[in-house]
Amino acid sequence: MSSNPSLFSRIIHGSLVLQIIVGIALAVILASVSASAASQVAFLGDFFVGALKAIAPILVFVLVASSIANQKKNSHTNMRPIISLYLIGTFAAALTAVLLSFSFPTTLVLVTGIEGSNPPQGIAEVLNTLLFKLVDNPVNALMTGNYIGILAWGIGLGIALHHGTDATKAVLNDISHGVSQMVRFVIRLAPLGIFGLVAGTVAATGFDALAGYAQLLMVLVGAMLIMALVVNPLIVYLKIKRNPYPLVLKCLRGSGVTAFFTRSSAANIPVNMALCEELKLHEDTYSVSIPLGATVNMGGAAITITVLTLAAAHTLGVQVDFVTALLLSVMASVAACGASGVAGGSLLLIPLACSLFGISNDIAMQVVAVGFIIGVVQDSAETALNSSTDVLFTAAACEAAEAKANS
């Protein structure tokens, strides 16, 4: 005699996307009815993001070490084409931002700069920071979420254990599966976590503060939408030679939605890993490409840096020719790849880009302050684009390699 599944069982095995949509709707309703009540449930969002950030470093370290240690001879990880796609995507994002900024010139109402901010003094400093993150203490890298360092030590341990005994490799593989199971549990908390994040955000801002920056937000979000729905699909089509939209939409739905609300590429790594597993991608590939993408695949950051820099130039009446704009695209692309190595991310790399037009640091920091005001939307959209693209390009490279092998 069959029995109806319990409510708990239905929740555990139900559609995660549908549950997230319900959570968003309930959060908006709660914040509209009672801002104080919405503020009190905001801790659920902090708890969820904290759980993701806590599990992500150990997940990356164990998965990378396990996949390399257990890698079969003559197997290919397709990392070179994935890294190429990351770089092409980031530059295309900066170029898209330039074209949209030229089409819709934006003037900023500058405000007081952010106190205590310490932007990098040049591109050399950004690259220097990234280089030294490679040789960070492994324990410190795990504690601070330094994914460049975690990748380096994970790869090193994996190579060292590749020649170890089968028993050692089996233990590492079992630990990897155990951590992955913990990640699945944390991801099931997404509807509750996003409910708290949305409720807290709407209660705190009401989005009234964003009204004065409507055009700037339209250019920023518009550029990111064009990248997500036009440029990225075109890049993927050239790679896999078939309709890219089923894959694009699956990545946006499975990765972008969660990333939009967590506003953290690092926190979204476990979500992306689970999506890659669902897509049946090569574990040896995605265990490296996803954390690497969370560090260097920064199309959204390139858009933010480019749009706000050109908005500052337009506000000050600085004439920008096409060659200079092209140079800005290159600089924004390189700077964006180092965004994860700078406290404050893409916003604090804006002074670096502004220096290209001779804009003073004082003015540049006022532009950064504008970025913090619109950060609720800007950072969410930027993270959603960055994170979903990690899975998209990984899947495209894996599919192209598989098609080539079968031909």
UniProtKB/Swiss-Prot annotation:
The chain crosses the membrane at residues 11-31, 43-63, 82-102, 141-161, 192-212, 216-236, 298-318, 339-359, 363-383. It is a multi-pass membrane protein. Keywords: Amino-acid transport, Cell inner membrane, Cell membrane, Membrane, Symport, Transmembrane, Transmembrane helix, Transport. GO terms for biological process: serine transport; threonine transport. It catalyses: L-serine(in) + Na(+)(in) = L-serine(out) + Na(+)(out); L-threonine(in) + Na(+)(in) = L-threonine(out) + Na(+)(out). Gene3D superfamilies: Sodium:dicarboxylate symporter. SUPFAM superfamilies: Proton glutamate symport protein. It comes from the Bacteria. Signal peptide: none annotated. GO terms for cellular component: plasma membrane. Involved in the import of serine and threonine into the cell, with the concomitant import of sodium (symport system). NCBIfam families: PRK13628.1 (NF010151). Belongs to the dicarboxylate/amino acid:cation symporter (DAACS) (TC 2.A.23) family. This is Serine/threonine transporter SstT. It comes from Shewanella denitrificans (strain OS217 / ATCC BAA-1090 / DSM 15013).
